[in-house]
Amino acid sequence: MAYRSAPLYEDVIWRTHLQPQDPTLAQAVRATIAKHREHLLEFIRLDEPAPLNAMTLAQWSSPNVLSSLLAVYSDHIYRNQPMMIRENKPLISLWAQWYIGLMVPPLMLALLTQEKALDVSPEHFHAEFHETGRVACFWVDVCEDKNATPHSPQHRMETLISQALVPVVQALEATGEINGKLIWSNTGYLINWYLTEMKQLLGEATVESLRHALFFEKTLTNGEDNPLWRTVVLRDGLLVRRTCCQRYRLPDVQQCGDCTLK
């Protein structure tokens, strides 16, 4: 059944926001982002009070709230084509691209440049949503993940996968409208792109090592399946997305420049 508009924040019980525990880490991450990718600070707030309508994953992923968010987003996407049959899979795929696309780059920058590892567990993040239903900004209660601090860049990226990304994919897959593999495919493309963006900062050797571990190893170091495995593949000497993100099925949405269907 296609999503249509409904009251957005009905029956949401707001939880007390976590108190910041490591202001020095917040300052260091903010300074690094400001120096290298200042525009990221437009949609990630570190140890700043979150607005009351910002939600943790546990809150926005509840069936009523998520259905309302997707309904509002559907109304926005189909606003100029009201008679067109609505498709939920490409809609959720694009919604997830917004969510993960705004979340992952600053977290990669934090995890791969700081001595202390940022705790990326979902309870430390509040998402503020745009009036169109997609995410607009993340408010982060900055804490150190003492277990991840001594880890290598590869292990830190695996922490990002297991703690920050898996819960998001599982929440969206629970709608029954999308296969998580599509979201992981989009996410692999994003991470590969941002590794290229970070090459000057991290060095080519580190970036290539991370690419191999993230995209060409079938399992993570803990033995679990690697959801990013072969989400990008080598074609004509370049790593490219393996599957289409499906946005071409939505009205008035710009197609990817390197769409696999071309």
From Swiss-Prot:
Quaternary structure and partners: Monomer.
Molecular function GO terms recorded: 2 iron, 2 sulfur cluster binding; ferric-chelate reductase activity; metal ion binding; oxidoreductase activity, acting on metal ions
GO cellular component: cytosol; plasma membrane
One Pfam family here: FhuF_C
Effect of residue 244 to S: Loss of activity. Affects [2Fe-2S] cluster binding
Membrane topology: Peripheral membrane protein
Named cofactor requirement(s): [2Fe-2S] cluster
A Gene Ontology biological process term: siderophore-dependent iron import into cell
Record entry for activity regulation: Displays pH dependent redox properties. SufD is necessary for the stability of FhuF.
Disruption phenotype: Removal of iron from coprogen, ferrichrome and ferrioxamine B is significantly lower in mutants compared to the corresponding parental strains.
Name of the gene this protein is made from: fhuF
Keywords annotated in UniProt: 2Fe-2S, Cell inner membrane, Cell membrane, Cytoplasm, Iron, Iron-sulfur, Membrane, Metal-binding, Oxidoreductase
Role summary: Siderophore-iron reductase which is involved in iron removal from the hydroxamate-type siderophores coprogen, ferrichrome and ferrioxamine B after their transport into the cell. Binds both the iron-loaded and the apo forms of ferrichrome.
Induction entry: Induced 2.4-fold by hydroxyurea.
Record's keyword annotation contains Cell inner membrane: yes
UniProt name for this protein: Ferric siderophore reductase
The record's note on its domains: Globular monomeric protein mainly composed by alpha-helices sheltering internal cavities in a fold resembling the 'palm' domain found in siderophore biosynthetic enzymes.
Residues holding [2Fe-2S] cluster: 244-245, 256, 259
Cofactor: how bound: Binds 1 [2Fe-2S] cluster.
Domain of life: Bacteria
Subcellular location field: Cytoplasm; Cell inner membrane
